[in-house]
Amino acid sequence: MKSLHDVLKRPVITERTTDMMAEKKYVFEVPLKANKTEIKQAVEKVFGVKVEAVNTVRVPAKPKRYGKYSGYTSEWKKAIVKLTDDSKELAFYEGV
């Protein structure tokens, strides 16, 4: 990876992930080649928190159609990051 900011592409914000934030679990989209160690280091350095665990999931490509044209969405990887109890919360909704 080039830098720690390249490891975390974007936070995944859905109804389910918003409920997970109460348990101090946060979900990020990460590159397919990123490993758990890189993800942990990136979250700790960028947000200044301590990470307890990292789980990763490869989201498979899904078939899509647009009229007679068919194709697939891109495969991507998400990381579920659990923070320690004494870590501060990450503020994704600041200024909204």
UniProtKB/Swiss-Prot annotation:
Cystines in this chain: none
High-level lineage: Bacteria, Bacillati, Bacillota, Bacilli, Bacillales
Family (UniProt): Belongs to the universal ribosomal protein uL23 family.
SUBUNIT field: Part of the 50S ribosomal subunit. Contacts protein L29, and trigger factor when it is bound to the ribosome.
Keywords: Ribonucleoprotein, Ribosomal protein, RNA-binding, rRNA-binding
Primary gene name: rplW
Protein name listed in UniProt: Large ribosomal subunit protein uL23
InterPro entries: Nucleotide-bd_a/b_plait_sf (IPR012677), Ribosomal_uL23-like (IPR013025), Ribosomal_uL23/eL15/eS24_sf (IPR012678), Ribosomal_uL23_CS (IPR001014)
GO cellular component, one term: ribonucleoprotein complex
Physiological role: One of the early assembly proteins it binds 23S rRNA. One of the proteins that surrounds the polypeptide exit tunnel on the outside of the ribosome. Forms the main docking site for trigger factor binding to the ribosome.
TM spans (from-to): none
PANTHER family noted in UniProt: 60S RIBOSOMAL PROTEIN L23A
Keyword Transmembrane assigned: no
Any GO BP annotation: translation
NCBIfam families: PRK05738.2-4
GO terms assigned for molecular function: rRNA binding; structural constituent of ribosome
Organism: Brevibacillus brevis (strain 47 / JCM 6285 / NBRC 100599)
HAMAP family: Ribosomal_uL23_B (MF_01369_B)
